[in-house]
Each structure stands twice: as C-alpha cells, then as structure tokens.
Amino acid sequence: MGTVLAFDFGEKRIGVATGETMLCSAHPLTTIHAESNEDRFAAIGKLVAEWQPEQLVVGLPTHADGTPHEMTRLATKFGERLARRFNLPVSFADERLTSLDAEARLRETGRNSKSAKPLLDAVAAQLILQTWFESPHHVIPTQPSA
C-alpha cells in the first residue's frame, strides 16, 4: 500500500503521525495548532502534499464501554471532511486510552507534562496509527463521497 497519515482530532489541536504499511510502524509527526477549520485543513493539505499518503486514519473517541459521545461525532465529521477534501480513503480506529498511553510514554522518556505537551497529540496519533496497523478488523473505512 504505502504511506498513511493518522490524526488525533481535538477541538484545539490535531496530532499527526505517519507510517508505512510495509513496515507497519508509526511515528509522531507534528501537532497542528489552528483556530479555524480553514487553517487546520490548509496545514493538513501541506502534509498531504508532502507525504502523499494513500490512506488516512482518524482516531475515534468513545466512552470506555465503546458508546459514542460528542467528540465521536466531531471526529467522524472531521474524517468525512478529510475524505471529501483530499479524495483519499479514511478509516476510523479506536482511540480509547491513547492519550493516557501517550502521556505514560512521554514520562518514560523523562519529560515532564509541561515539556511533553507539544508532543502529546502527535504521540497519541502515533498510537492510533499503530493500533490501526495491528488491528485491521477494528477499523471502520469510509470512501470519499461526491
């Protein structure tokens, strides 16, 4: 397949990770800090142009029992916009506990919460992508719509 970009969607920040399907390994890339959707999608557009992914993955937040909540709806809407805007397939991957896992991983590297904050969302996106690589049966694909 090729390159994949993954997103940890948030209302204030979007973490981004990249990976290769041949290696099934994910790496944190960046965190997008943008107020408006226009600025967010412009930044994502630059990443799509640079990395030329064949697939996009969006973390799908849910309650611990798997039931949806407001951020589930917003992340789904974000994924649908990605599919339409970039004409790329988008999959949703379970992101339960990825932020906690990302915090723990950054603490293990000796970073305190303040110094780790800029990396947190990108590491969460990395974990989302790694989950997608390891658990293809847990993804919910969507194709770009006209």
Curated annotation (Swiss-Prot):
Its main location: cytoplasm. Its EC number is 3.1.-.-. It is an enzyme of class 3 (hydrolase). CDD domains: YqgF. GO terms for cellular component: cytosol. Pfam families: RuvX. One of its GO terms (molecular function) is nuclease activity. It comes from the Bacteria. Gene3D superfamilies: YqgF/RNase H-like domain (3.30.420.140). GO terms for biological process: rRNA 5'-end processing. Belongs to the YqgF nuclease family. HAMAP family: Nuclease_YqgF. PANTHER family: POLYNUCLEOTIDYL TRANSFERASE, RIBONUCLEASE H-LIKE SUPERFAMILY PROTEIN (PTHR33317:SF4). NCBIfam families: RNAse_H_YqgF (TIGR00250). Could be a nuclease involved in processing of the 5'-end of pre-16S rRNA. This is Putative pre-16S rRNA nuclease. It comes from Dechloromonas aromatica (strain RCB).
